[in-house]
Amino acid sequence: SGAEFKYKNDVQKWLDIIRGGYAPKAVEYLKTGTRPPFPYSDIRLLPYLQHSFWFLPNVAACHAMANLLAEKHNTFWRQYKVVVAAGTLAGIGLDALPPVRKAIRSGFDTKTITLSCGKLTTGVTVPQWSSILMLRNLKSPETYFQAAFRVQSPWSIKNPNGDNPNEEEILKPVCFVF
């Protein structure tokens, strides 16, 4: 769809900021050697942003974000497969899940961003999701916590070396809610 943000330049600026660019105090950071941990630029956080869930206000915002992330100048974001799990085309309820699983595959050699305004925020477990960006105002704390729980599910492999059925390798030791 041709969806676009009304304040597209501001949203673009935000995309640049979460990557560590366009920081108003960039000169100060250079002088002091300190820098806040922006999600998509801090090497300590990046491994947990390999598969993220962005919770947006509505279907139009999901499509506008997908379009903006795909724009030619946004080269960083093109390493992520963006899945829009919003609107009638995404299907009802769990029907929105297969495209997400297909994009993630095993989760090791892929990077994904799932855009949603409500679908897949309850009753769904995608072990590879390890971060959620809350990009909307939520009236109910239940909605907030239900969405946050999506990234809290464990991701581990039982018997990773094939020689100890009691051994478990934890692949997702932490998760983040931004």
Question: Which functions belong to the PLM regions below?
Answer:
Residues 1-116:
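Conserved C-terminal RecA-like helicase domain
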Residues 77, 81-178:
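Conserved RecA-like P-loop NTPase helicase motor core
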